[in-house]
Every structure is written in C-alpha cells, then in structure tokens.
Amino acid sequence: MKIYLVGGAVRDALLGLTIKDKDYLVVGSTPAEMLSLGYRQVGKDFPVFLHPKNQQEYALARIERKTGTGYDGFSCDANEHVSLEEDLLRRDLTINAIAQDEQGQLHDPYGGQQDIIHKQLRHVSQAFVEDPLRVLRVARFAARFHSLGFTVATETMALMSQISLSGELEHLTAERVWQECERALATDEPQVFFEVLAQCGALEVLFPEIHALFGVPQPEKWHPEIDTGKHTLLSLKQASLLTDDMAIRFATLVHDLGKALSPKESLPKHHGHGQKGLPLIKQFCQRLRVPNDYRDLALLVSDQHQNIHNAFELKASTLVSLFDKGDFWRKPERLNGLLSACIADIRGRTGLEKSAYPQAAYIEHCFQLAKQVEVQKIIADGFIGADIKNQLNRLRILAIDEYKQSLIKKQPN
C-alpha cells in the first residue's frame, strides 16, 4: 500500500500557488483494508475514503472505461493491481497528472512538469475525448491560469473541437455545465473561458445565446470593437476588475443578448435590445438552472442599463419608478449591482477601458435623497391608505427634482 498526493495540490505547489484542498491516491490497497484501518467510505461510483483523523479524501487507484455517453458513461475498475501510472493516465491534463509520494519525490510519467515550464494545458492521452466535461474544465483552467501565461496546446484544442462536433456535449447535465461556468466566472480572467469555448466550437452548443452575438455589428462611433460578442467579453473582463460578485459578472455577460435579435435592416443600431433580451436571459437561466439571484439581477441590468447610461436626461419621476422597479428600497445592493454592470458595459470597449462614468455617482445620490423621505412623517401629517404611498412618491420625486435644479444652476452660462 502506497499513498501519493495528487492533482491540484501538487500542481499548485509547483506553480507557487496557495494549496486549498489535498487529494490522496492509494495504490495497492482494497476497500476492505481501508475500512480496517479506520477510513470511512464516501464514494458511490468509485472507492473514496475519508481519513479517520483529518477527514481528507483518499481514493483507490482506478481505471475507467467508456461504456456510454456523457461524462458519467464510464465503468470503474479499482483494485490493488492498478498502478500509479495507470491511474494518472485517466486524468485530463498533464499538469494534473503529477503525484508526490510520502518521501516528497515527484512522479511525473506524462510530462506535466515540462508543460508547467512551457505554460501548456495539454491532454494526457487520447482518452481525453471520452469525457465531454473536459472541454469545460480545460476552458476553466485556461481562464484560471491565463494570468500565468498558460494556453491550450494546439493538439488539445483539436481534441476539444472533435468533442464539440461529436454530439457528446449535449449529454452534459445542466448542473455540470453551470457548475463549470460559475467556477469560471470566479476566476480573474472569466472571458477567457468563453473565448476558448468559442475557439473549439463548444460555445455554440452550450451557450448559443452568447455565440449568437459574434458577428453582430454595433455603431463604430460608440463601439470601436464593433462586434457585439467581442464587446460582451471585454465587458466581462471589466466586470472582473470591478468586483468579485459573480452575480454582477453574470449579469454583465448576458446584458446585450437582445442585440442578436435586432433586424438586419436596422443594424448596426439595436433599438430596445435590453427588453428584447429578457426572454433570452430567462431561457438561458432556466436551461442551465442558474440561481434566481443571478437571474433577477441579469434581467434588471438588461432592462435598465440604457436608462442608467442616459441618467442625466431622465425625469425625477422616471428615476423613482426605476428605484421602485428594482426594489432598491428593500435591496439597495441590487442598485450597486446594476451600476457596476453599467460601468463594465461602458468600459468594455476597445480603447475606452478607463472611461469615467459619472452616472453612477449621480444615480446613487438621487437614490439617497429619495431614501431620506420618511414615511412616519407622512403618516404624522395625516395621510392614510393609498395616499401615504402617493405622497411618499411625490416627495421622493420632489427631492430629486430639487437636486437636478441645483445642478442646472451650477452650470456656467
């Protein structure tokens, strides 16, 4: 019985990154022996055990054979005769197929250390094509390690394209697709995830609403990058610089889906694209079972981002209506999410990444003024029933109007 540290812990140590989780591989043992040593079995599909003291995971070495479609269409053979090399052979990337024994010696039969040196995400074997989930995993690793200079090896990208054409991606469950997407959104370079999927043909299969944006032109006056797909990913990058909040990043990703529905004769203009995108966002979120808070913010951003961009031209009554619609009185963090996504939208344009966005401070100030209106004072003044809400609305509008008038007076003649 031999025990090895494997996978991400070894890889991250070699990259000089913080190690979060440790996974161990056990070679030359059986479930019966593990149980006799006090380990507790937790794996249903293959033998995984928890250490009796530290509760870390220990998996028996195994061989997998393709038996059906999708990422779970495999049979598992875990026995005491499976070697370290055989277990590492089934792993996705060479950088994830390095093991460290109890003496600290590295075992690297497939060249993972060389690929770390050369910053390559490379498949271990041709069996890579048997698991469609690996397309998403490699794209996620490309996003995660982009800042370190990693790229997908040419031959690995070819295999990813092969999987995309095979129909295997359609067998992935919504939960697994969203899980990988959400983990990619949490990286420092989330846009790279979608760039890699587009490059191998998987974007069209798994995220057709985003794929449809590529090739859709926008007015060059406002969008030097012209292409809506490019703008979307540039905006996502800007969102990642502004916030770690994944709901805001997701809302930024889907804020312009409606532009794919603009009539060809009206291009490059996109009248009402925010509202046209609402059914597409709902469809996207329902298909992939996106969390409700992500969906709700995404719908708000799509519906209102043009209004926020035009904030200085909006009437006070329109602003109060916007605050009502966004439920900002109860959930002020939603206003922050909306404004952050709008900033990312404005800065997600080639050459305009440093653009100022005074609309955000203006909207925030208007909201704070409206929020200062006290309901208790309205009740004390004798208003009852529906008149309370009407007076509250009137005073909120008045507060914003007075502020707007003060700004006009400050302007030079």
From Swiss-Prot:
This protein's cofactor list reads: Mg(2+); Ni(2+)
Taxonomic superkingdom: Bacteria
**GO annotation terms (biological process):** RNA repair; tRNA 3'-terminal CCA addition
Residues binding Mg(2+), per UniProt: 21, 23
Q: Which Pfam families match?
A: HD (PF01966), PolyA_pol (PF01743), PolyA_pol_RNAbd (PF12627)
Q: Which residues bind ATP?
A: 8, 11, 91, 137, 140
Please state the Enzyme Commission number of this protein.
2.7.7.72, 3.1.3.-, 3.1.4.-
Which GO terms fall under molecular function for this chain's record?
A: ATP binding; CCA tRNA nucleotidyltransferase activity; cyclic-nucleotide phosphodiesterase activity; magnesium ion binding; phosphatase activity; tRNA binding
Which InterPro entries does the UniProt entry name for this protein? CCA_bact, HD_domain, NT_sf, PolA_pol_head_dom, PolyA_RNA-bd, tRNA_CCA-adding_enzyme
Keywords of this protein's UniProt record, alphabetized?
ATP-binding, Hydrolase, Magnesium, Metal-binding, Multifunctional enzyme, Nickel, Nucleotide-binding, Nucleotidyltransferase, RNA repair, RNA-binding, Transferase, tRNA processing
According to the record, cofactor stoichiometry and binding are noted as: Magnesium is required for nucleotidyltransferase activity.
Chain positions recorded as CTP binding sites: 8, 11, 91, 137, 140
- Reaction(s) catalysed (UniProt annotation): a tRNA precursor + 2 CTP + ATP = a tRNA with a 3' CCA end + 3 diphosphate; a tRNA with a 3' CCA end + 2 CTP + ATP = a tRNA with a 3' CCACCA end + 3 diphosphate
User: What are the HD domain coordinates in residue numbering?
Assistant: 228-329
Q: Which family is it part of?
A: Belongs to the tRNA nucleotidyltransferase/poly(A) polymerase family. Bacterial CCA-adding enzyme type 1 subfamily.
Domain comment in the entry: Comprises two domains: an N-terminal domain containing the nucleotidyltransferase activity and a C-terminal HD domain associated with both phosphodiesterase and phosphatase activities.
**Any additional notes?**
A single active site specifically recognizes both ATP and CTP and is responsible for their addition.
Record text on subunit structure and interactions: Monomer. Can also form homodimers and oligomers.
Name the NCBIfam families for this protein: PRK10885.1 (NF008137)
Its biological function? Answer: Catalyzes the addition and repair of the essential 3'-terminal CCA sequence in tRNAs without using a nucleic acid template. Adds these three nucleotides in the order of C, C, and A to the tRNA nucleotide-73, using CTP and ATP as substrates and producing inorganic pyrophosphate. tRNA 3'-terminal CCA addition is required both for tRNA processing and repair. Also involved in tRNA surveillance by mediating tandem CCA addition to generate a CCACCA at the 3' terminus of unstable tRNAs. While stable tRNAs receive only 3'-terminal CCA, unstable tRNAs are marked with CCACCA and rapidly degraded.
* Matches recorded under HAMAP family: CCA_bact_type1 (MF_01261), CCA_bact_type2 (MF_01262)
Q: What is this protein called?
A: Multifunctional CCA protein
Organism annotation:
Shewanella denitrificans (strain OS217 / ATCC BAA-1090 / DSM 15013)
